[in-house]
């Protein structure tokens, strides 16, 4: 019997495993991942941005964890020889409406304690000769990294300290009882643990349901489609270039991202995916599609955002429509500059009353803790999220009348998190 089993080998699961084994070095800890390597889903299919914390409600978990995670991610990269680039983010307003929204973001960045600089149109053009706008905000602490590399380093650290990673282990059933949780996999394996930790991303709600618990949300998958610019445009921008987002929408808009390999990507958009892991337009699951349209909450979201949703679908099918979104601030790009690039799928939790759950969300049962909503900036925030989960695990074990074998916490989780932010 394991003391702890973590389900999910993305960056949240790996961060949690890495920190849990530091707190409980004598514990038997396993991580189950259905794929053959870490970071095969959301972690390995995102923009790679180290976010600063521009957009998030002051005092929210997103705001707090992003600010801490920005520094923690860079420190972890320094400790593990992972390349990153603190290139800064430029927010660009292209209309008077966006200027008004940008002023609100200016106040929010102040409330979140960020260093930033207000730029006039001329100052913006001086910094970014290929970008046009009425003004901008420059946030110097944003950066870029490969989160797949970060998650892999976390996995290596976990294994080096005695943790076990079991790949090709897709969970098919969970049974919670007084002394722990029994895990069954599609490969016919049965594993028992005193405490279960769910970091299942796109499958988070299904994992909770396996325990016989109504999660109070459903995961709605949104595919984010990208293009890569032709190599001659690798130096078209000096920073990460973001539009001013519509505050009514949960996503940040199509942006230009300087990738860590030197290329520049455009994206992502946000299109309803008809399969939980539907990375291609042709990926359709009848079961997943039926589940989406049976959900009153998701139907309400689609109704409330009908026009924008139809616009996203149109731009997904028509490259010229997609291009026009980025030409608002980078007019020199042409359709021929947009080259194919892999898409990602974002797991967005939706409440039964049709609200897009904005903050990070955690759900607990007597023997388990689950990360249930971890959209952007979850990758940036992975180390503080992992520390948060470990603190919840410690509290859960203390509340259990029979927590399994006695384990001594070798380190306080706050001290552990501080090790990544020195």
From Swiss-Prot:
Provide this UniProt record's keywords sorted from A to Z: Cell inner membrane, Cell membrane, Electron transport, FAD, Flavoprotein, Membrane, Oxidoreductase, Transport
Which cofactor does this sequence's record say it needs?
FAD
Reaction it catalyzes: (S)-2-hydroxyglutarate + a quinone = a quinol + 2-oxoglutarate
SUPFAM superfamilies for the chain: FAD/NAD(P)-binding domain
Give the signal peptide range.
Answer: none
Q: Got a GO cellular component term for this one?
A: cytoplasm
* UniProt-annotated location(s): Cell inner membrane
Example GO biological process? L-lysine catabolic process
Matching InterPro entries, A to Z? FAD-dep_OxRdtase, FAD/NAD-bd_sf, L2HG_DH_bact
* GO MF terms held by the record: (S)-2-hydroxyglutarate dehydrogenase activity; 2-hydroxyglutarate dehydrogenase activity; flavin adenine dinucleotide binding
State its Enzyme Commission number(s). Answer: 1.1.5.13
Query: Where mainly found?
Result: membrane
Give a yes or no for keyword Membrane in this entry.
Answer: yes
Q: Which domain of life is it from?
A: Bacteria
Its pathway, per UniProt, is:
Amino-acid degradation
| Family to which this protein belongs | Belongs to the L2HGDH family.
- Do you know which PANTHER family this protein is assigned to? L-2-HYDROXYGLUTARATE DEHYDROGENASE, MITOCHONDRIAL
Q: What does this protein do?
A: Catalyzes the dehydrogenation of L-2-hydroxyglutarate (L2HG) to alpha-ketoglutarate and couples to the respiratory chain by feeding electrons from the reaction into the membrane quinone pool. Functions in a L-lysine degradation pathway that proceeds via cadaverine, glutarate and L-2-hydroxyglutarate. Also displays some oxidase activity in vitro on L-2-hydroxyglutarate with O2 as the electron acceptor, but this activity is most likely not physiological.
Q: What is this protein called?
A: L-2-hydroxyglutarate dehydrogenase
């Amino acid at each position: 019997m394991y003391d702890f089993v973590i389900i999910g080998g993305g960056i949240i699961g790996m961060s949690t495993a890495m920190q849990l084994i530091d707190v409980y070095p004598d514990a038997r800890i396993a991580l189950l991942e259905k794929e053959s390597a870490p970071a095969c889903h959301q972690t390995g299919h995102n923009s790679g941005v180290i976010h600063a914390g521009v957009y998030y409600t002051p005092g929210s978990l997103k705001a707090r964890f992003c600010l801490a995670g920005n520094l923690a991610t860079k420190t972890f990269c320094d400790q593990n020889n992972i390349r990153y680039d603190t290139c800064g983010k430029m927010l660009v307003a292209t209309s008077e409406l966006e200027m008004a929204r940008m002023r609100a973001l200016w106040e929010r960045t102040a409330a979140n304690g960020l260093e930033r600089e207000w730029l006039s149109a001329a100052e913006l053009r001086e910094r970014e000769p290929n970008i046009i706008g009425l003004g901008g905000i420059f946030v110097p602490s944003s950066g870029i990294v490969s989160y797949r590399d970060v998650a892999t380093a976390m996995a290596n650290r976990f294994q080096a300290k005695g943790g076990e990673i079991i790949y090709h282990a897709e969970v098919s059933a969970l049974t919670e009882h007084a002394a722990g949780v029994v895990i069954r996999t599609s490969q016919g394996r049965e594993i028992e643990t005193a405490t279960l930790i769910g970091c299942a991303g796109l499958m988070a709600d299904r994992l909770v349901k396996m325990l016989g618990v109504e999660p109070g949300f459903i995961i709605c998958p949104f595919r984010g489609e990208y293009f890569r610019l032709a190599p001659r445009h690798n130096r078209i921008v000096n920073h990460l270039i973001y539009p001013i987002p519509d505050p009514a929408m949960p996503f940040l808009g199509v942006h230009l991202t300087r990738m860590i390999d030197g290329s520049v990507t455009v994206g992502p958009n946000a299109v309803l995916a008809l399969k939980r892991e539907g990375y291609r337009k042709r990926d359709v699951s009848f079961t997943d599609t039926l589940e989406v349209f049976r959900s009153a909450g998701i139907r309400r979201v689609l109704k409330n955002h009908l026009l924008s949703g139809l616009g996203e679908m149109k731009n997904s099918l028509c490259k010229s429509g997609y291009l026009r979104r980025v030409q608002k601030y980078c007019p020199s790009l042409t359709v021929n500059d947009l080259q194919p690039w892999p898409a990602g799928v974002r797991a967005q939790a939706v409440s039964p009353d049709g609200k897009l759950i904005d903050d990070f969300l955690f759900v607990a049962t007597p023997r388990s803790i689950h990360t249930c909503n971890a959209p952007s900036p979850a990758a940036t925030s992975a180390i503080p999220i992992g520390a948060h989960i470990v603190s919840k695990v410690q509290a859960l074990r203390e509340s259990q009348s029979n927590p399994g074998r006695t384990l001594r916490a070798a380190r306080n989780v706050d001290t552990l998190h501080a090790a990544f932010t020195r």
